[in-house]
């Protein structure tokens, strides 16, 4: 899985935040737009695009795009 593709797919789950604002260091929970709906959309995206099922509790342990990316790569 390529980091730039992951950032693009991750950013697509946000309506108001431009993809250019996302990096692997982005603390996504601190974004003004962050909500539980984004979390569900991200979990769904990971399932569909990467064929990996993450539980909400697993995602709760991550704060940055990099941490989420690393968690997915462990699966």
Question: What residues fall within each predicted segment?
Answer:
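Phosphopantetheine-dependent thiolation modules in NRPS/PKS and related acyl-activating systems
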Residues: 1-34, 38-44, 49-75
């Amino acid at each position: 899985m390529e980091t730039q593709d992951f950032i693009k797919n991750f950013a697509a789950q946000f309506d108001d935040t431009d993809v250019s604002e996302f990096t692997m260091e982005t603390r996504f929970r601190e974004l003004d737009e962050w909500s539980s709906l984004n979390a569900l959309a991200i979990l769904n995206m990971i399932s569909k695009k990467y064929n990996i099922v993450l539980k909400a509790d697993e995602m709760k342990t991550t704060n940055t795009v990099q941490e989420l990316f690393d968690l997915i790569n462990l699966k």
